[in-house]
């Protein structure tokens, strides 16, 4: 999970990882928390006990969704194999759209076999500076500021705006602080 987070931070693309149910999944906790605070688009796949034995105390069974509920942007649980493509696509879309980790929880028996399904088209958004009105308002605020300070973080990195942030800091003679886990947000 730490490697998936690192890959996502370095590439701006999805980092993906999968664990064994039970102890493998619980080993993801600190890495997924780090990805959450760094706004890394990580999709982590958590195999679950088989669909017919959930809640019966199977080998290494634990309730996996509550463990990650506060450190994910979205949690998808496949409750029917026919929804596999839909929920998988949703996890990948939400990881990028909301910039953070998503959990794809799949009962173990759904990993096998063939299904007929339509694969949804991924949602893509362009990262940009904002609309003209927002930019005008930001320029007015900066022009009126006596001691502007820049906080540069994950949004700057993912929007490939590090060089622009450096230029702005030079233009304004403004000090720059970086957000937690984003020392890469300013040169």
Go through the PLM ranges and name each one:
Residues 1-187:
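N-terminal alpha/beta PP-like core and its mobile active-site loop of ThDP/TPP-dependent enzymes
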């Amino acid at each position: 999970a730490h490697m998936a987070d690192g890959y996502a931070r370095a590439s701006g693309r999805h980092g993906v990882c999968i664990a064994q149910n039970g102890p493998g999944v619980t080993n993801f906790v600190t890495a997924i928390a780090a990805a959450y605070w760094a706004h890394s688009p990580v999709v982590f796949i958590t195999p679950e006990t088989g669909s017919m034995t959930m809640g019966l105390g199977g080998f290494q069974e634990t309730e996996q969704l509550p463990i990650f509920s506060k450190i994910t942007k979205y949690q998808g649980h496949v409750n029917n194999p026919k929804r596999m493509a839909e929920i998988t696509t949703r996890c990948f879309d939400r990881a990028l759209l909301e910039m953070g980790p998503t959990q794809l929880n799949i009962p173990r028996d759904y990993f096998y076999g063939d299904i007929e399904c339509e694969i949804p088209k991924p949602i893509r958004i362009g990262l940009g500076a904002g609309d003209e009105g927002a930019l005008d308002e930001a320029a007015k605020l900066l022009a009126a500021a006596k001691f502007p300070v820049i906080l540069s973080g994950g949004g700057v990195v993912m929007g490939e705006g590090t060089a622009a942030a450096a230029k702005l800091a030079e233009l304004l003679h403004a000090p720059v602080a970086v957000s937690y886990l984003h020392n890469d947000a300013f040169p």
